[in-house]
From Swiss-Prot:
GO terms for cellular component: virus tail, baseplate. It is found in: Virion. Forms a dome thereby closing the central channel at the end of the baseplate. Changes its conformation upon activation by calcium allowing the channel to open at the bottom of the baseplate for DNA ejection. Homotrimer. Belongs to the skunalikevirus baseplate protein gp16 family. Keywords: Viral baseplate protein, Viral genome ejection through host cell envelope, Viral long flexible tail ejection system, Viral penetration into host cytoplasm, Viral tail protein, Virion, Virus entry into host cell. One of its GO terms (biological process) is symbiont genome ejection through host cell envelope, long flexible tail mechanism. The keyword ATP-binding does not apply. It comes from Lactococcus phage p2 (Lactococcus lactis bacteriophage p2). This is Baseplate protein gp16.
Length: 375
């Protein structure tokens, strides 16, 4: 049976204030409070990352919507927080209580996703680096919940991901989901004692580090003994259309008097000017689904870029997902890169989540989308 700590809400309005006196006289953010209750956890389904599913558990003390629940596991998780600097974290899963029924069964939202809920990201930020986007997301000045920093593997999140959008902002949930899918990594949350021995505070960190700084692919196989289930996941949801008829406003007439240009999404996901296509049609969709688009020219008189049109007619990215019981002889951790043999076929991807119940310990493997760096 698991145990849990229950806290009042980690409200940044209170904790994001730098008036805590350190032994050296420096002022820091207020640390987390002591738990208001310790309880047991039964009838639970607990997701470690919660990128897709909501958790639930029945607690042996009363909880309220807005409370924070830290589930404690008799297990340690290895991470390498910097190159050559390995440590082991006690496995804990931190949630926000979003609902409680009459039997005191709580609906639990993973802390990271609850923290950034309702936050929007300006497109100026999404056009920068992955690190800059994450730094924008993990900011208690803007977020719903308090955090004190993060363990971060810069090698995993190196580079830039271009997120094509028509609107001026994108939801933080959407941006985060797309970045994590692209780099094959999901964040977790942990409550730890402050790194300095002279710092008495307990703090909450977001973990963006895996068990090895340089992740190496692990090859394994799963079979019927691990109760495998297979389905699909749409990691990037785009358009139901595959053909665009594009009108661009004529500046002289201030109307759509110029002949339209046509664009088509090929079977491999590329979007091309249809007038330049000289193939035999076998690499094009079996059924054309057209959409008519109207655009103004920009301030310099330029028509829309191809990337703008691509958003309108690119197909969704759908990948295979395998859910199976943990193999105690070869334990896998969330964010491991894995090549899995199943029923004679090799799937390449990563462990995106882990779910613990009273009866089993199961992993979610998500296949790599293997798409260009436009998400």
């Amino acid at each position: 049976m698991l145990e849990a700590n229950v806290y009042d809400n980690f409200n940044p309005n209170y904790y994001n204030i730098s008036d805590f006196s350190m032994p050296n006289g420096k002022k820091e953010k207020r640390g987390l409070p002591i738990p208001k209750a310790r309880c047991q956890v039964i009838n639970y389904e607990l997701w470690e990352t919660g990128y897709l599913y909501t958790s639930s558990a029945t607690l042996t003390v009363s909880v309220e919507v807005g409370d924070i629940v830290q589930i404690l596991f008799p297990e340690v998780v290895p991470i390498e927080e910097a190159l050559g600097k390995k440590k082991k974290l006690n496995l804990d899963m931190v949630y926000l209580v979003t609902d409680v029924d009459e039997s005191n069964k709580a609906t639990l939202k993973n802390y990271f996703w609850a923290m950034i809920e309702s936050l929007d990201v300006p497109n100026a930020i999404t056009k920068t680096t992955n690190f800059a986007i994450i730094d924008y997301l993990i900011d208690p000045n803007k977020n719903n919940l308090m955090s004190y920093g993060y363990f971060f593997n810069s090698s995993i999140f190196a580079g830039k991901a271009t997120i094509n959008r028509k609107a001026e902002t994108s939801s933080a949930h959407d941006v985060a989901k797309r970045i994590f899918s692209k780099v094959q990594f999901q964040p977790t949350t942990t409550i730890q004692h402050a790194p300095s021995e002279t710092d008495p505070r307990n703090l909450l960190f977001i973990n963006f580090a895996s068990r090895n700084w340089n992740r190496k692919r692990i090859t394994t196989r799963v079979d019927i003994k691990q109760s495998v289930t297979m389905d699909t996941e749409t990691i990037v949801e785009r358009s139901a259309y595959n053909f665009a008829v594009v009108f661009v406003k004529n500046k002289a007439t201030d109307d759509y008097t110029d002949p339209p240009k046509m664009y088509i999404a090929k079977n491999n996901g590329d979007v091309i000017d249809y007038s330049t296509y000289h193939g035999d049609g076998t690499d094009l969709p079996d059924v054309r689904t057209a959409k008519t688009l109207f655009y103004d020219r920009d301030d310099h008189g330029n028509p829309p870029e191809l990337s703008t049109i691509k958003v309108e007619i690119s197909p969704s990215t759908i990948v295979t997902r395998l859910i199976f019981n943990q193999n105690e002889l070869l334990p896998l951790y969330v964010n491991d890169l894995v090549d899995i043999w199943y029923e004679g076929k090799l799937y390449s991807g990563y462990i995106a989540d882990r779910v613990k119940t009273e009866f089993n310990d199961r992993l979610i493997f998500v296949e790599s989308g293997d798409k260009p760096n436009v998400i």
